[in-house]
Structure formats: structure tokens, C-alpha cells
Amino acid sequence: QDLDLNSDLNMLIWYAANTGHKTAKKPEVCTVRQLAAFPVGKSPPMVYLTGQRSLSLSRAEIETLREYLTTKHGMLFADNGGSPGWHSQFFNLMRQVLPRTDPRSVPLDHPVHDGMPFLPIVAPHGGRTAYMWVVENRIVAYYHPGDIGDAWADGHAGVPRPVWEACYRLGGN
């Protein structure tokens, strides 16, 4: 979603410029199945997942995602790209991926929100609360309810500068 508007590329460029971390020159699209092929220590550190329609994974994909988040120490950044239904589907998916881990709301003073005076919401498709899933004191999944990818896209979806700047900051954190 929003790949044609360069949302992923813009976020990658912002991240490289503002953190000094080495990044790929361009974003990579990967399926959940492809995550299984990465050995421990070589998988992507973070996967961005967005959508607005149906979200369904096979049992094998659910197991792959569980392994990516726990054994391979990956992180999932999920962004509700357009519907209350996607919100429910994502939470249901996470109950299957991490059945013993309940989502927690992320307070504004949490380190993942460092440098942001407010939670940036472009469109509140999934409400106005961010959630995280924590395993062994590490955030393994972060859910953003408000279409952050639109703010990363070319033109920033017309949202005010403070909002899209905070969206980049959140993506970088």
C-alpha cells in the first residue's frame, strides 16, 4: 500500500539521514513466507506491515511470523492503512502469532515515542491508541492506528508539517 507514492522509500531516506545507520539504498518488499529463508542474525531487523482490506495468513505463515519475532529477534511495525476491520484482523492475527502475549497500550512517555509531543495520526482508522506486544522485555510488534504510511508518502497526504515530521520520527524510533 502506498508503494507507488514512495512512502517506504521516503521513510528509508529519512531514517538513514537522521540516524546515521547504514541502510539499503532502496526498500525491499518481502512476503511472510520469505522471512522463513533468513537465518538467525540475517533477517530484516524490522518489517513494516500495512493494509486496509483482508488480512489472513496460513498456519505456516503464522509460525514463520512467530519465529521471526521471537527466535530471529525481528520487529513488526503494523500500520492500519484504512479500516476498522483491519484493526480487528491484526489483533486477531497477533493472538494467533503470540497467544500468551497481550497487547499493551503505548503511553506517550514510552521511549518508542521519544521526541514526539503527540501520537501522530493521519486518519484514525483503528482509533487513537498505539499498541505494543512485548516478549522478554523487547517490543516485538508495534501497532499504529492511523495510517502513518500516508504521511511518509510523497505530498504527505496533505497533513500539516508537525504531523508528518512526527510520523517520520515515530518510524525512526
Language-model segments: which ranges?
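Alpha-helical scaffolding within the catalytic cores
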Residues: 28-36, 58-64, 125-129
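Extracellular/periplasmic catalytic domains that process cell-envelope and extracellular macromolecules
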Residues: 38-43, 69-71, 132-137
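An acidic, glycine-rich "communication" segment
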Residues: 84-172
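Short alpha-beta junction capping motif
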Residues: 46-87
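Structural recognition of the beta-strand scaffold that forms the well-ordered cores
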Residues: 45-49, 75-79, 102-105, 140-144
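Aromatic-Pro/Gly-enriched surface loop or interdomain linker
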Residues: 1-46, 50-54, 148-149, 155-173
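Extracytoplasmic/secreted envelope proteins and their assembly/folding machinery
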Residues: 8-12, 62-66, 87-91, 171
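Surface-exposed patches in mature extracellular/periplasmic domains of secreted proteins
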Residues: 21-34, 78-82, 101-109
